[in-house]
Amino acid sequence: THAMLLDALSGQQDEYQDLFNDNRITFSEAMAKLYQRINPHIDMGQRTAQTIGEELLDYRNYLELEVEVFRGADGWLRAESGALSTGEAIGTGMSILLMVVQSWEEESRRIRGKDIVPCRLLFLDEAARLDGKSISTLFELCERLDMQLLIAAPENISPEKGTTYKLVRKIAGNQEHVHVVGLRGFGATE
């Protein structure tokens, strides 16, 4: 049934365009209504069109992803989210992210027929939970992969390379200002 949905979308048949030109419904709802038109024999139950559409757009309904981590003498073990160390969780997430980014870039090159250098940004929130070694590993990985790393943390992270910026909010009277203070890396350059 999902193949029929993809076929209807790729064929861009006129009979379905009314769903995607209607500003009163969301894209998720349009997907659900398209799915219902193609599969009238399937009972959707009490679920809303929004819920059905979100399920259709959720990649987890199309992929079964298993990740293994190498644990020294124990060898390769299946990664369970609750049993991963912070470093393993970051590494697992990074490996998935990098594969997605690389496939997007390859597809973009294929479609456009041009070798455009992408702007590769990696965003990391809650960086205060990471130790210095984990942060250094992220910096090294981003440097090797030609990515820029943007970190959000409640305290300063002193980089060996690159620049960190501290945002300081100041209120004077009825006006609020944000001061940006930059700290340049102090590590040795090669």
Curated annotation (Swiss-Prot):
One of its GO terms (molecular function) is DNA binding. Keywords: Cell cycle, Cell division, Chromosome partition, Cytoplasm, DNA condensation, DNA-binding. One of its GO terms (cellular component) is cytoplasm. It is found in: Cytoplasm, Nucleoid. GO terms for biological process: cell division; chromosome condensation; chromosome segregation. Gene3D superfamilies: 3.40.1140.10. InterPro entries: MukB/SMC. Pfam families: SbcC_Walker_B. Plays a central role in chromosome condensation, segregation and cell cycle progression. Functions as a homodimer, which is essential for chromosome partition. Involved in negative DNA supercoiling in vivo, and by this means organize and compact chromosomes. May achieve or facilitate chromosome segregation by condensation DNA from both sides of a centrally located replisome during cell division. Homodimerization via its hinge domain. Binds to DNA via its C-terminal region. Interacts, and probably forms a ternary complex, with MukE and MukF via its C-terminal region. The complex formation is stimulated by calcium or magnesium. Interacts with tubulin-related protein FtsZ. Belongs to the SMC family. MukB subfamily. The hinge domain, which separates the large intramolecular coiled coil regions, allows the homodimerization, forming a V-shaped homodimer. This is Chromosome partition protein MukB. It comes from Haemophilus aegyptius. The gene is mukB.
